[in-house]
Structure formats: structure tokens, C-alpha cells
Amino acid sequence: MVTNLQKELIAIETIKVLYQQIKELRETVNPKRLGKYSDTFFDSLSEDWFDGINLSSWMRGLNTSLGQSFFENVAHILCNGTKKEFTAKKKSLLQLSQSQKLRIANIITDLSNGNFYPDSLADNDEISEALEALEEATGFTADVFFEDDDHVVCIELKTVKPNKGVFKVEKQKILEAKEALRRSYPKKKVKFFIGFPFDPLSIEPTGFDKQRFMKYSVGFDKYFAESEFLLAAELWDYLSGTKQTMETILEIINSIATVDFIENFDFLQQKENATDKKSEYINLLSKWFLLREIILVENRESIRSKTSSNKRIVRVFNQDVFIIKREDDKYKVEYNEERNAILSSFV
């Protein structure tokens, strides 16, 4: 199951994205003119709020970089993974034989000409036969990378409407990456997926149809088998190892992304509310899944009594829950993890 700490970390990512997007849009444009974005996301800027939001609406309401960052961070939280680069810049290029590169290129040609079907197992069996002197493999970055005792898993997160022609390039890159990873992790099974956060064609927020989705993206079924990509709920369940993870993510988003989001955020930033309006403060923290912060509020008097003679700790106690910065006309919001860690040691 998704743990309480994971829920809190996902909630923090949601808060960061919402605050940044809303503050910037309020300063630059009239929300009612944003027809190209989803109503459900941007109604949080107006008086009308649509009860219930899905990841399709959430993603369309974010700019590309902000949305990509959100999904990557949530993925890392769920699987305890990281983003990992195997690139020349990072001096972490893997190795591959020239014959393997040639065989992969031939497979791509056969796929392009319709002479070969995208069966990942057949691809891997054929390529792995090649053994000879090694050279540097093509660099790549895994948006999600995690390793356990038996497996190495890489996932590349994509937008749900990739550009035409991208799948040929992606297939070749993934085939090369899998073979190079096998050489680096010879005792482990290597898996490499493309991941799509949601199915834009599904009526249900967490629903998906892989065959329909493959037809929706031009050229997808020419290069990839169903087993080579993870879609919507399938992706999130795979990352967490538990069912109904996508429902949990949506529950968190819906609890936070309301019409009074900015007012709620400001309420939590006002430290005196933790004392003067303690019950209301704790209720909002609970609604926003900020469970570690609840522990601090409930133990506020005890912490103060233990630290009253320590000016440094008193100053930490008086810091904001969230740190707000503005860099290059962009808002950056971070949960004050250092404050929480220091104060939690006195609970």
C-alpha cells in the first residue's frame, strides 16, 4: 500500500506545482481567457470549481516542464527510485558491441518496413547473441531508475501525445540501452518501459485501453508491443507495487486543488494559527496529508518547553512551513524539511 509518508510527499509535490502555476498565472494573464488549458485545473483561479479532477486535466493544465517534473517526482516517491543519466556529460556511458548496434539497426529497419513485429523478447534474444569488442553505447537518461536484488528497471515517462516519428528513435534507444545495461548488470534482469501517466481517451479517470491508445499515437504499434509500455493506472500500480495507486494520487490532488487553495496555503503559513486556531489548522493539515506537521502542532507546547532556552531552536520553530523563493520570475516552493527534522527530534 502507499504509505502515509509517500502520501505526504506526493501532497507536497502537488502543493509546489499548484502554488507555482497559480501565482504565475494570476500575475500574467486573465484565467478566463485560458481556453487552451483545462477548465478543471484553472477553475481553482475563479469562483467555479469542478468537483473532481483527473490526471488528463491536471497534465493539460500544467506547462510541459512543470508537468514532467511532477510526474517524475511522484514516480520516484512511489518506487524509491531516481532519475539516472548514462551520458558522456556524466561520464557514465555504458558499453555495447558494434555487432549489437548493427543488429539493433537492422531490427529497426525491419520494423519500419513491416517485416518484423515488435516482440520485445524476440528482439532481446537476437541481439544478445552478439559478443565481441565493446565501444561506447549511445547515451540515454532514465526518468525513473530503480534496482533491487534481481532486477534493474528503467522507465521513460512520455507525454500522452508524442510527436510523429518519435517511436522509431525511442525503440532504437531502448534496445541499445537494454543491451548495454545487461552488460553492466549481468546477474540481474533488465526491464525498460515507456510510461504514460494517463490515458487521454478514457472516460474513467483511472481507466485505460492499451490497444486503443496504440492506435491513437501514430506509429506506436509499429515499433512497440503492449508489454513494453505502462499506461495510466498500470504505470502507477507498477511503481508502487500496490493496486489503486492512481486513485490515491487523485484523492490527494482533489483534496488540495480547491478554489480556496491559496487561502489555505496562506493560513498554514501564518504560525499563530497553529495555536489560536489549532483545531482548524490540524484539520487542514490532515486534508492536505501533511501528517508530520500535525505531530509538530500536537506537540507544540512540549517542544517549546524543551527548547525555550535554546535561541537557535526557537528560531527554527518560528520558521515557515513552506519556503517560498522567486528566481527568474518563477515561484519556487519547498516544504521546510530541515525545520521538520530538527523539531521532530524533540518530540
List the model feature ranges, each with a label.
Residues 1-93, 275-347:
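Nuclease-adjacent, charged terminal/linker segments that flank catalytic cores
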Residues 190-282, 291, 295-302, 319-346:
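Domain-level recognition of nuclease-like catalytic cores that cleave nucleotide substrates
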Residues 74, 100, 158, 166-168, ...:
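A short acidic (Asp/Glu
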Residues 91-149:
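Active-site metal-binding core of divalent-cation-utilizing nuclease and nuclease-like domains
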Residues 79, 142-161:
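Conserved catalytic cores of phosphodiester-cleaving nucleases, focusing on short active-site segments
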Residues 150, 187-191:
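Short glycine-/polar-rich loops that comprise or flank the Walker A/P-loop
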Residues 59-61, 128-132, 159-165:
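Surface-exposed cleft-lining segments at the edges of enzyme active sites
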Residues 159-184:
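Mg2+/Mn2+-dependent nuclease catalytic core
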